């Protein structure tokens, strides 16, 4: 009997079993504890998530980062309490994240701080309410994203659910009315809607009925559009909306809830700060169709010239472009002749409509617009079609108008869509026939084959430009009457070389020009190098000497070769141009003839001795002046 307890006490098997049982029990306790702690952790996390979701719904309108509403501060401490009540909710929710603030709109809260403290804080503020930023309304967001919209919609419903706590404290509600200036309105804790631009008086606080959170939400969705977008508000800037701000409501429709923080500017069309665009090629007017791609660029707008829809092509008159910038507003009366214009103004060509305007690609300052003289019509003259002034079946014996012709008989151009009729070939005639044709045209100025259009006023040109461009066009041998026959032969060689008209019936199809594209390309190059830029560039750029319609510039000699007597309009133009040149002082009889030395003929040795004799008394002092004028 005594051996058994000793054996049992010294048995290591039983001891190890006890240890195993102890470890098993400890492991079970540890497992139970871990399960309990995990359950607590899961429940705590779920509770925190639930609380955060609830707090997010109640605090959604303060997620914009706005400061507490201090615009409703007044002298009475009772007004301080509701104005700082949202700030206390924010502070309480930040420090006590798990504490649920359900009735945010109640007057008294368990975590509300004493009123006197807020009163002391606000009384010490050096700023008044007018210096503070406008309060954001309850639908103000940083963004208009879907999540923010969902939160704002849900928060408005929660706000309606918790309005029951204040109804006992509210005054008797008045009929529903909206403050017309309620654009930056704010719901305070009483449910009253305040308007920022108006003064915070007790009378204004009584003008709005109490249960209006949903009304403000739905009304301000439309009405706050008339003010600036919320993302454009600067806290330190106060904007007073005008009384007629609701008139522009339809202009901002569609700019709400576009999914971004920036305002929707798709409906706003801001005018260009520049009066004219930088590149005139981008603003060719819509009423100038593709047939005249040479068009009227925006430089015509600077000149004050209105373009007409009936103009199908324009005359390129490079020698008058510089003057048009100065004299386009000085219109001459209708029917007035301009006899002082020189023949270089006749040497114009039609712009080739098949060549784009970009072929004249120079800078806007340098390039001058090819302008038809007939586009200078003021008033209602420019708004009607001038291309109908021709009879479509009449023979086109007259080509585009020159500035030297009387403006009451000048047509614009050929019909735009028809190929030009046959034009008579140039014939080899000497230049003195010019005077013969002038006499015929002065005798019968009315014998014309085209219908005379209505009088069109034309701006007067500058005579200084006429002198400079005349010397640039004609050089030093145009009026040299010593070689008329040589000029005629040379011009005919020029005519055969360029061959502007292959046959009497030849013409370019679908164009309004009587010349080949190569000629127009040369003219475009001349325009690119500043043909009409300034007075001096007229002479410098004429090394190109492009082939014009009536002038093949082979050197300095113009190609003025007349046809038969039936070309009345052409001869009339040349006669008027030569008459204008004679008035300018370029008389063909005595200007360019080098016979100044022949004026010494009346003088003799006796006359020279009379001049050298100091004792000799002249009968008239004007005789000595006349000798001095002859450089003696």
Curated annotation (Swiss-Prot):
GO terms for biological process: cellular response to cAMP; negative regulation of adenylate cyclase-activating adrenergic receptor signaling pathway; positive regulation of transcription by RNA polymerase II; protein homotetramerization. Pfam families: TORC_C, TORC_M, TORC_N. GO terms for cellular component: cytoplasm; nucleus. Residues 105-115 have a biased composition (Basic residues). The keyword Coiled coil does not apply. It comes from the Eukaryota. The modification Phosphoserine is found at residues 66, 133, 145, 293, 372, 391, 556. GO terms for molecular function: cAMP response element binding protein binding; transcription coactivator activity. Residues 310-338, 372-405 have a biased composition (Polar residues). Keywords: Activator, Cytoplasm, Nucleus, Phosphoprotein, Transcription, Transcription regulation. Binding, as a tetramer, through its N-terminal region, with the bZIP domain of creb1 enhances recruitment of taf4 to the promoter. 'Arg-300' in the bZIP domain of creb1 is essential for this interaction. This is CREB-regulated transcription coactivator 3. It comes from Xenopus laevis (African clawed frog). The gene is crtc3.
């Amino acid at each position: 009997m005594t051996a058994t307890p000793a054996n049992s006490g010294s048995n290591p098997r039983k001891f190890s079993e006890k240890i195993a049982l102890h470890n098993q029990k400890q492991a079970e306790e540890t497992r139970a504890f871990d399960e309990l702690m995990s359950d607590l952790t899961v429940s705590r996390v779920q509770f925190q998530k639930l609380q955060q979701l609830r707090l997010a719904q109640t605090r959604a309108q303060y997620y914009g980062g706005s400061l507490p509403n201090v615009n409703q501060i007044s002298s009475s401490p009772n007004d301080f309490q509701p104005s700082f009540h949202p700030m206390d909710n924010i502070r309480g929710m930040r420090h006590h994240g798990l504490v649920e603030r359900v009735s945010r709109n109640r007057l008294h809260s368990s975590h509300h701080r004493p009123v006197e403290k807020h009163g002391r804080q606000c009384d010490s503020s050096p700023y008044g309410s007018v210096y503070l930023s406008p309060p954001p309304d309850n639908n103000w967001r940083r963004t208009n994203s879907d999540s923010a919209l969902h939160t704002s919609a849900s928060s408005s419903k929660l706000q309606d659910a918790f309005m029951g706590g204040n109804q006992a404290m509210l005054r008797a509600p008045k009929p529903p009315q909206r403050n017309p200036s309620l654009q930056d309105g704010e719901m305070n804790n009483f449910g009253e809607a305040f308007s920022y631009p108006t003064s915070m008086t007790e009378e204004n606080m009584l003008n709005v009925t109490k249960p209006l959170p949903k009304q403000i939400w739905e009304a301000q969705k439309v009405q706050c559009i008339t003010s600036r977008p919320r993302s454009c508000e600067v806290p330190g800037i106060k904007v007073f909306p005008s009384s007629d701000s609701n008139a522009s409501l339809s202009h901002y429709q569609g700019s709400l809830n576009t999914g971004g923080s920036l305002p929707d500017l798709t409906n706003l069309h801001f005018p260009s700060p520049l009066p004219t665009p930088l590149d005139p090629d981008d603003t060719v007017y819509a009423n100038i169709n593709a047939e005249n791609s040479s068009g009227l660029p925006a430089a015509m707008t600077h000149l004050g010239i209105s373009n007409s829809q009936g103009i199908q092509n324009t005359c390129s008159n490079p020698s008058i472009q510089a003057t048009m910038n100065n004299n386009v507003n000085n219109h001459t009366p209708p029917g007035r002749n301009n006899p002082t214009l020189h023949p270089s103004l006749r040497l114009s060509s039609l712009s080739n409509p098949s060549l784009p305007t970009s072929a004249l690609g120079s800078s806007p300052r340098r390039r001058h617009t090819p302008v038809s003289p007939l586009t200078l019509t003021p008033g209602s003259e420019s708004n009607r079609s001038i291309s109908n002034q021709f009879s479509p079946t009449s023979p086109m014996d007259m080509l585009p108008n020159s500035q030297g012709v009387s403006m009451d008989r000048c047509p614009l151009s050929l019909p735009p869509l028809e190929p030009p009729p046959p034009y008579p070939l140039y014939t080899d005639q000497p230049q003195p026939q010019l005077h013969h044709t002038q006499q015929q045209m002065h005798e019968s100025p009315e014998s014309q084959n085209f219908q005379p259009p209505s009088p069109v006023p034309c701006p007067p040109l500058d005579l200084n430009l006429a002198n400079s461009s005349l010397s640039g066009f004609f050089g030093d041998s145009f009026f040299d009457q010593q070689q008329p026959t040589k000029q005629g032969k040379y011009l005919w060689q020029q005519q055969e070389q360029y061959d502007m008209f292959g046959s009497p019936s030849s013409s370019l199809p679908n164009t309004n020009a009587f010349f080949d594209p190569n000629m127009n390309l040369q003219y475009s190059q001349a325009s690119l190098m500043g043909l009409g830029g300034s007075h001096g560039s007229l002479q410098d750029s004429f090394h190109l000497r492009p082939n014009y319609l009536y002038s093949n510039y082979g050197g300095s000699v113009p190609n003025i070769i007349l046809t038969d007597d039936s070309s009345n309009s052409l001869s009339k133009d040349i006669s008027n141009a030569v008459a204008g040149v004679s008035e300018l002082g370029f008389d063909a009889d005595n200007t360019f003839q080098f016979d100044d030395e022949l004026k010494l003929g009346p003088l003799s040795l006796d006359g020279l001795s009379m001049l050298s004799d100091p004792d000799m008394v002249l009968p008239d002092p004007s005789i000595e002046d006349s000798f001095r004028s002859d450089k003696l």
